[in-house]
């Protein structure tokens, strides 16, 4: 007796209509959505066939060449994996496979993924027990590169050269740039076995979220010059990455890169992660840091930062603080063509060289700026004036300008970074930059 395909119910037809033409701007976005979608319906799908974006004829043309590691596939056919265990004692012939399927394709504009076809009528009932046994969150991402059990196990830990080699042996392909990033780290460990690297993967996904990097050379610099640390953060670098660097100030007053961190945009508590990793790599500097200068985001992490660096004064970089203040003033209607003097006034406030000068500038600000901005300023900035006004700066008596040092480092960094969107290329550029600095220092010593 031949089984017939069941007719779709009204509920199934509605589900199909909701799923059709749904768009996703990355394979990771689709995978996260699809995990939840399957969990709600107790169904397991697997990839029957696929074509990678890198193999398409348009892979080297804009905008696709910038999205190869983001979109991953130009075509994917997902079929229902009927996980019911067959009854070996039955004499009936095997049932045909479940007809449910979903097709995802690259959009005509080649900038997103679209569900182009779906048939959601199953030939079997949902089975919670079998679903719980067979379903693995993140399997669409894991199938492309690394098993998520491995990435979950090693995530948030320092990795040794042997760990990187082990991860490489498990890699099934270059998806998500994981293979490329691991190869960069393998090359780093080959030349610097004492380097410190911490990897963080997105939970239940074979996708690198954060990489902390410190070479043996920069660790030596940090241990030699731990007194003043500067934090330079470049959010949204190349549109796809956040980059953070910790700089130490040497005896000649130069900012030297001690450690760096590459992360997915919007990674929470990145500064805390950076400092924790730094102190784990060089625990002897904890009580020797006297000043830490960072961006305005440090204000929201003060308690954690002061616990990590109990002997350090915490400051906000004045240049970055001014940018934040002016941006907020624009948002609240206090910086426009009608009020062109606000920026100079904020600059005078931040650059005050005495408490008297600060009080005078503050009184002027209160009389000129809109009420909404003043309320914001009084709540968030006035109580912390000792963190961002010049006359309270730690380095003021040492003839140093922390903001200028950070700006100089940023210019040098941007000159050396490639116009790439991948974690691997950013790591490659950072490693090359550090070795170039080391070579230059060696040449100077030889002169």
From Swiss-Prot:
InterPro entries named in the record: DUF5575_C (IPR049218), DUF5575_N (IPR049217), ZSWIM9 (IPR040854), ZSWIM9_RNaseH-like (IPR048315)
GO process terms (BP): hematopoietic progenitor cell differentiation
Family matches, as Pfam families: DUF5575, DUF5575_C, DUF5575_N
Name of the featured protein: Uncharacterized protein ZSWIM9
Organism of provenance: Mus musculus
Name of encoding gene: Zswim9
